Amino acid sequence: MRVSDFDFDLPEELIALRPARPRDSARMLVIGPAENALADKSVSDLPSHLREGDILVFNDTKVIPARLFGTRRRGEASARIEVMLHKRESADEWRAFLRPAKKLNLSETIDFPGGLSAAVEEKGEGGEAGLRFSLSGPALDAAIAAAGEMPLPPYIARKRAADDEDVADYQTLHADEPGAVAAPTAGLHFTPALMAAIEARGVSTVRLTLHVGAGTFLPVTAEDTDTHKMHAERGEITEAEAAAINEARAKGGRIVAVGTTSLRLLESAVDEAGTVHPFRGETDIFITPGYRFRAVDVLMTNFHLPRSTLFMLVSALRSTEEMKRAYAHAVAEKYRFYSYGDACLIYGAS
């Protein structure tokens, strides 16, 4: 498929720079279950769209302050380098995107505040590099936490700098496992009050972990989806989590993924019969129209970028044309887009 098939117009003023307050007051566009059916709701209305026996699947990854600013020194000359961590390789190694990468050679060192430094061990395409830090394990984690900033998406960072509000705003209610460099943004809408209302409905919940990487922000540069390569992300579904999901389905409940990260991990761990298995490892699953969903029945997600892999994913749940019509409706009704924006509840096409 052509990547241009997934393009659409989005006025820049609809890109949300701050979240709704309270979080569950964000708007929610319900798409389906009937073809072309749309309903303008609020996230606080979510319980009314759930049934007793359904199970909500959350991603409990926690965002780390993965944007670092350091200095490369070469004799008397120096250059400021922005480092965006995106994938941990070992106790002292990270994959990262560097800017400007051209100002760094192999084996050169980047110095960060607090005495932390990193050597460039490998250079790849698009500014990607392999870094080995001067600290490892928990000591490295603490140094990154002290020196780093919250890694706001580029479309927000271009408009304003990260601040103290983002430290809380860019974490979900369920954030528990440090390792993500981007938030699983559908989870940002949940509050204790909303969770209580969901529980009162007889809906169960389960948490799994997918550490979201910076690759989620990378533009698709290929012209055809067949030639696009996804960045891999680490995830885990425990035996108990898989059992809870399978039990809910066996009893007639629907699997409701909160966010595309939860959906992608579930679809990476499911077999042809629809049974979800324990999973620990990396996934680079790339879902486009024509994909047959085996694990997920309903998806709650935010509004995504034109030509992005995530807009391709939601188009696979319904159809590209139906999702374009839904997004056109959202634009006309001035829904707020992207990470801090409003939500969609998308029923899988039957």
Swiss-Prot record:
The keyword S-adenosyl-L-methionine applies. One of its GO terms (biological process) is tRNA wobble guanine modification. It catalyses: 7-aminomethyl-7-carbaguanosine(34) in tRNA + S-adenosyl-L-methionine = epoxyqueuosine(34) in tRNA + adenine + L-methionine + 2 H(+). Pfam families: Queuosine_synth (PF02547). InterPro entries: QueA, QueA_dom1, QueA_dom2, QueA_sf. GO terms for cellular component: cytoplasm. Its EC number is 2.4.99.17. It is an enzyme of class 2 (transferase). Keywords: Cytoplasm, Queuosine biosynthesis, S-adenosyl-L-methionine, Transferase. GO terms for molecular function: S-adenosylmethionine:tRNA ribosyltransferase-isomerase activity. Its main location: cytoplasm. Pathway: tRNA modification; tRNA-queuosine biosynthesis. Transfers and isomerizes the ribose moiety from AdoMet to the 7-aminomethyl group of 7-deazaguanine (preQ1-tRNA) to give epoxyqueuosine (oQ-tRNA). Monomer. HAMAP family: QueA (MF_00113). Belongs to the QueA family. This is S-adenosylmethionine:tRNA ribosyltransferase-isomerase. The lineage of its organism: Bacteria, Pseudomonadati, Pseudomonadota, Alphaproteobacteria, Hyphomicrobiales. The gene is queA.
